């Protein structure tokens, strides 16, 4: 399981000219499930994202988590994170899941995330999404579990 999280001042996801997710200060998380991912991976990733301290405290130190500041998050399914880019000039997606399995796994991850934290919005799996965000920093982290 892979994720790239970005601290944002605001973010939104648009599909077919319709806004499907919209947050103010929080996190935009690009999320990729892989073939071997299990519920344990989903639990660990959700905990990592929720508890990771990327927001500044009063002293200006990154010491506060999503929970600490009661912020929102958008989970965006992003299969291209699984691309193997080591050879050639075209990405390979051999470690990614077939779409129907990946959709189920992403939904399972979303459900686990929602059980742990309630201020969650999502993009739409398989849709052509337009993702708009204003980075705060920028502050970006990459996770592999």
Curated annotation (Swiss-Prot):
<dbReference type="GO" id="GO:0019478">
    <property type="term" value="P:D-amino acid catabolic process"/>
</dbReference>
<keyword id="KW-0963">Cytoplasm</keyword>
<keyword id="KW-0820">tRNA-binding</keyword>
<dbReference type="Pfam" id="PF02580">
    <property type="entry name" value="Tyr_Deacylase"/>
</dbReference>
<dbReference type="GO" id="GO:0051500">
    <property type="term" value="F:D-tyrosyl-tRNA(Tyr) deacylase activity"/>
</dbReference>
<dbReference type="InterPro" id="IPR003732">
    <property type="entry name" value="Daa-tRNA_deacyls_DTD"/>
</dbReference>
<dbReference type="InterPro" id="IPR023509">
    <property type="entry name" value="DTD-like_sf"/>
</dbReference>
<keyword id="KW-0694">RNA-binding</keyword>
<protein>
    <recommendedName>
        <fullName>D-aminoacyl-tRNA deacylase</fullName>
        <ecNumber>3.1.1.96</ecNumber>
    </recommendedName>
</protein>
<comment type="function">
    <text>An aminoacyl-tRNA editing enzyme that deacylates mischarged D-aminoacyl-tRNAs. Also deacylates mischarged glycyl-tRNA(Ala), protecting cells against glycine mischarging by AlaRS. Acts via tRNA-based rather than protein-based catalysis; rejects L-amino acids rather than detecting D-amino acids in the active site. By recycling D-aminoacyl-tRNA to D-amino acids and free tRNA molecules, this enzyme counteracts the toxicity associated with the formation of D-aminoacyl-tRNA entities in vivo and helps enforce protein L-homochirality.</text>
</comment>
<feature type="short sequence motif" description="Gly-cisPro motif, important for rejection of L-amino acids">
    <location>
        <begin position="137"/>
        <end position="138"/>
    </location>
</feature>
<dbReference type="GO" id="GO:0005737">
    <property type="term" value="C:cytoplasm"/>
</dbReference>
<dbReference type="GO" id="GO:0043908">
    <property type="term" value="F:Ser(Gly)-tRNA(Ala) hydrolase activity"/>
</dbReference>
<comment type="subunit">
    <text>Homodimer.</text>
</comment>
<dbReference type="GO" id="GO:0000049">
    <property type="term" value="F:tRNA binding"/>
</dbReference>
<dbReference type="GO" id="GO:0106026">
    <property type="term" value="F:Gly-tRNA(Ala) deacylase activity"/>
</dbReference>
<comment type="similarity">
    <text>Belongs to the DTD family.</text>
</comment>
<keyword id="KW-0378">Hydrolase</keyword>
